[in-house]
Amino acid sequence: MKRTICLILLAISLLCPATAATRRALIVFIGDYPESTGWNKLASANDRTIILKMLKDNAFLPENIICLQDREATHDAIVNALDRLLSLAETGDRIYVHFSCHGQQITDQDGDEALINPRDIYDEAIVPADACIAYGWNGYKGENHIIDDVLNRYFNAMTSKIGKRGCLLVVNDACHSGGLERQGADSDTLHFRGTFDAFVQPFEGSPEKPGIQPVTWVSISACKDFQTNFEASIDGKRYGRLSYAMARSFHAGMTAVQLTEALTRTYKSMPLPTGKAQTLASFIPEKLKNKKLFGQ
């Protein structure tokens, strides 16, 4: 009898994974920038409410959610949170990362962007609470902007740790406002994220050899790189357009393709300023297109 029980337990242990996959999240919402930074206020607090509810409704446990808001979301705090998320990640984990804040282009110091587009001299960056709007603003030189090269290294490291059974979804409601939309935009009446002006630094170069980092995760951004990321007014409240669409569209059993299709439908139903356009931007690695993002 004891031998039979032992054999049953052994069979169960072989059939079940050693550790259950965990749903983890890092969510960053910055709307109340210090006046000293030069950035205008955003409605990111409203985004926080609906994204936290979305995660709760999709079985993310509070202890597995790292949330930074407003002035606590400094450069160091965001980097420390990324370090923590990376250290916690295990094989098979499903990870959700969300940025709801300002975004800005910044001088590309290592030349990697030009490998894709020879005319591109800027990196993309998210703007923490302690980053200023322009070079020299209150003595600021750009040290607190977090560029896409840095984020990509974290995300590639995460996908390496979680492996083929895991999945990483990165949602960026922090796009810069593209230059082609500059004409006719009125910042007094239209609420948008980012700025038309790039953060231009003196070019110093980088000791790192430029290279293109592969994208091994699902990436969704609020707009194309030449468009403006407008906030949406819904029932008298402002929201980030992508944050609102995510909260309305996302459920854990979706594939990446199903999610982008649902987001596009929601986008079309949302109001936009007269004469303006905003199109969802996404990148899905071929092997992840039909994979359930947060399913089993």
Feature locations, PLM:
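Positively charged n-region of N-terminal signal peptides that target proteins for export
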Residues: 1-4
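Bacterial N-terminal signal peptides
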Residues: 6-14
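Cysteine endopeptidase catalytic domains of the caspase/legumain-like
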Residues: 16-296
